[in-house]
């Protein structure tokens, strides 16, 4: 029996959807405060995908990831996401290092360009995960799966 905390996964997916809505709802990212907001929205979007990916991997007792890229590879191998989506996520992953470790030298043009070019993978991720969970565990019930 698998232990997949659907409630926690759904909470993170809802948060991701909110973050993406905020990002797409704002069209002018010029200015210090706007740049900081964009940085946070992008970082938490990336972290949401990684956290949900880890929860799915742990819950279904898939192989242990050794890196962030490995999380994406496992999700692709297990057919949670397509190869196309995996490629898009891997293009965005280096932004996390820029935001978390190289935060003094963030290239905002690159940040916006790379994330915007690959945002569709993030927008589709919640439904891909929900569909995977439903196919593997069945529909949500009153009991925790």
How should these model regions be labeled?
Residues 1-145:
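Solvent-exposed interaction patches of small proteins and small membrane subunits
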